[in-house]
Swiss-Prot record:
Function: An accessory protein needed during the final step in the assembly of 30S ribosomal subunit, possibly for assembly of the head region. Essential for efficient processing of 16S rRNA. May be needed both before and after RbfA during the maturation of 16S rRNA. It has affinity for free ribosomal 30S subunits but not for 70S ribosomes.
Species, as recorded: Sodalis glossinidius (strain morsitans)
Source superkingdom: Bacteria
Gene3D superfamilies per the UniProt record, alphabetical: PRC-barrel domain, RimM
Family per similarity comment: Belongs to the RimM family.
GO molecular function, one term: ribosome binding
Main localisation: cytoplasm
Gene assigned in the entry: rimM
Protein name: Ribosome maturation factor RimM
Compartment(s) where it occurs, according to its Swiss-Prot or TrEMBL record: Cytoplasm
GO biological process: ribosomal small subunit biogenesis; rRNA processing
Pfam families cross-referenced by the UniProt entry: PRC_RimM, RimM
Length: 185
């Protein structure tokens, strides 16, 4: 079990990023399962403070401690003392400010930065907008919502994020991802 330090006056996130989600209550003493969206599950604890949104307001979440139980990560939230109180946090997204995230090497991207980018083939065909990403184990996959006037009648495309092979260029400033991809797929 890892004890967490207390946080003093905490500013709400300026650029909120979801790093996980609170799961079901665990036991009767206010513990909860947590589902991490970070590459290494335990890395979620490196990004503090955590916030949840309640009644359209950011609320900081103070972690008292955490531990691994079998395959799950279990957390104890400060001032949550019983199962009933813990259950109220179930399904709350865990948010941190983007400034907490480490800088990436060239050619590496946070999913949050790819969302909303327009995807264009090397031939100039507009495939659509990145609306989601999926992790498949072998590589990440862009979920691209096709343009309304798509000539192929496709509503959604799944494009593997294979740098150099499929992904030819990522221009985050222009929000454009250039791909070598057949528009018919």
């Amino acid at each position: 079990m890892v004890k967490m330090s207390k946080q003093l006056r905490i500013a709400a996130p300026v650029e909120p990023v979801v790093v996980g989600k609170m799961g079901s209550a665990y036991g009767i003493r206010g513990w909860l399962r947590v589902f991490s969206s970070t590459e290494e599950a335990e890395s979620i604890f490196d990004y503090q403070p955590w916030f949840i949104k309640r009644a359209r307001e950011w609320q900081p979440i103070g972690l008292e401690s955490w531990k691994r139980h079998n395959q799950d990560l279990i957390i104890k939230v400060r001032d949550i003392e019983d199962r009933e109180a813990a259950t109220l946090l179930t399904n709350c997204e865990i948010v941190v400010d983007a400034s907490q995230l480490p800088d990436l090497d060239s050619g590496e991207y946070y999913w949050k930065d790819l969302l909303g980018c327009q995807v264009v083939t090397v031939g100039g065909y507009q495939l659509g907008e990145v609306i989601d990403l999926m992790e498949t184990g072998s590589n990440d996959v862009l979920v691209v919502k096709a343009n309304l006037k798509d000539a192929f009648g496709i509503q959604e495309r799944l494009i593997p994020f294979l740098d150099g092979k499929v992904i030819k260029n990522v221009d985050l400033a222009a929000h454009i991802i250039e791909v070598d991809w057949d528009p018919g797929f």
